[in-house]
């Protein structure tokens, strides 16, 4: 992919080292890639947590890349669990994602991964 194509591409589901067993890239590495490729925006979308959100936002914005904060929540419908990416548009959205992420752990009976059901969304 040419550099100009990379610059215009917005990756919306990056999993960092905070997505255990799913992502391995470190925030510092994302920062360097963003700077080198002049990427306009990136979305951090770790699974069931926002542990890297502050570090990501601070470091990525320093190299001129717009950080997009999100998470990937396990969503249960009947007996099926799927993945639902959620992104914050602003501070209110960020706080709501924090609430939903916490709720996915608090209401979990321990027999499955943290998840939300339709009513909780």
Regions found by a protein language model. Name each.
Residues 1-121:
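Phosphodiester-processing cores and adjacent nucleic acid-binding clamps
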């Amino acid at each position: 992919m040419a550099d100009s194509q990379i610059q215009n591409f917005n990756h919306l589901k990056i999993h960092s080292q905070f997505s255990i067993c799913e992502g391995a890239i470190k925030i510092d590495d994302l920062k360097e890639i963003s700077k080198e490729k002049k990427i306009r925006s990136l979305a951090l979308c770790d699974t069931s947590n926002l542990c890297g959100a502050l570090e990501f936002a601070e470091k990525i914005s320093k190299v001129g890349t717009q950080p997009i904060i999100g998470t990937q929540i396990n969503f249960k419908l009947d007996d099926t669990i799927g993945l639902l990416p959620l992104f914050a548009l602003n501070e209110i959205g960020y706080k709501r994602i924090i609430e939903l992420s916490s709720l996915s752990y608090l209401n979990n009976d321990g027999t499955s991964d943290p998840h939300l059901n339709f009513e909780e969304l």
